[in-house]
Amino acid sequence: MKTTLLAVIGMSPAVITETLYGLHGRGDVWPDNIKVITTAVGAQKLIQQLINANPLHQLCHELGKPDISFTAADILVVPGSDGVPVADARSTEDHEALANFIVTTVRDVTRNNSERIHASIAGGRKTMTFYLGYAMSLFGRRFDSMSHVLVSEGYENHPEFFFPTRSPQLLQLRDGRTLDASDATITLADIPFIRQRHLVPQLLKEFRETVNFRELVELINLGEDPAAIRLSVYTQSRQVKITSVYEPQLAVTVQISNPWHWALYVLLAEESIRDEADRGSYGRPQSSKADEALAAEMALKLAELNGLELLGDSVSALLTELIEQDDLWTNHPNLERSLVAVKEKGGITGDQFSTYINTLQTELAAKLPANLVLVIAPGQTFDEQGELLAVTGRIKNRGGFYGIPLPDASQQIRFVVD
C-alpha cells in the first residue's frame, strides 16, 4: 500500500521535512509522495525552499531513505471565491472556498483504498489546519493517520532549518546567538480523530463534484436534531425536500427513481401524519403469504399520483391496467418489472417489501448523511397502538409498523402537489 503525505503549509515549507524526519524517528511508513495545500504565496516559498534548494533530497540521503519526488505539480493552490488562486484568504467568501477546496481534496485522495494518507496539520493558517483535520474526520479511513510536529525552541520557523542534521550546521539567530541544527529535536505528535466517513452521502464519496463543506456540516448536524427537520413531499415529481427550521438557507432535494417505490413512500408519509389511533397499517408482509391489500393500495396510489383512474376489482386487474399504461412506464422500465413481479406473486411478499424499503433508503443515502437518512427514510416507526417506537429506523422491532420516523411527523411533513 502506497502512502501519501498530505499537508497544509503557510510560510514554513520546513514543516514537510520536519514531519518526514519525525515519521522516520518513530518508525512509521516512509511516504511515496507528497501533496501540499497552500496559498499562492506559500507555493512560491515551497518552490524556492524545497524544490530549488532541495533539502528534501538531503534529508532522504542522510536518513538512507528513498528519494520522494516533489514538483510544482504536487502543490495544490487554494482558489478564492472567484476561482483564482489566492495569496491569502481574507474574505468570508475566500474562507468558504478554502474549506470546500481542502475537504474536496481530502475526499479525492481518500477514494483510492490502496493508498493511505498521513495528514500533517503543523503548517498553514489555523483555519486551514482545522479544515484539514475535520476533512480527515469526514473522509479518513481506519488506516489513515494525522500528526502535528513539535520542534525544539529556537529552531521553529528559522529560514535555514529543515531537520536535525548529522553534521554540525550553525544557524544565526536574530539576537546574535547561534544554534546548531544537529542539536535540534523533533517530536511527531499523533493526532487521534473520530472517523465519520459512514455519515457522508455516498455520491460525495464516489464522484468528483466539489464538496460544499458548510452544507455537509449543516446536514450532519440536522441529522442529530430530528425535531428541526422539515420534509416537503412533492407527490408528482417524486421528490422530497429537506430543510431546517434553524438554517433557512439549507435545502436539499432528492428524487426517487422508481414510481412504484415512490407510491409506497407517499403511503408511509401519509400514514405518519395520521392520528395515533389510525396508525399502524403497514407492516412487513408475512413470508408465507403475499399481501394483496398492500399491493392494491400501492396500485391505487400510483394511479392517483399520475392522474389515472383504475376500474379493476382485484389486485391482478389493477396491476394489469397499470401495466397497459404505456405512457406510465415508458420512461421507467423498472416500473414495469416491479408491477409484473407483484402480479405474478398475487401481491407483495415480505422480500419484495424489504427490497422497496432498502432501495428507498439507498437512494436517499446517495445524497444525504446517514444519520439524516435514518429519520426521513421509511422504517419501523409505530407499535400496534400507533405509538412511536422507542427505537425507530433500521433497527428491527418485532411487530413494528412502518412509517417515516420523525419525532412529530404531523408537524414536520407537508405534501405539495406539483
Describe the function of each predicted region.
Residues M1-I117, F130-D418:
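Long, low-complexity, Lys/Arg-enriched
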Residues I121:
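Conserved SAM-binding loop
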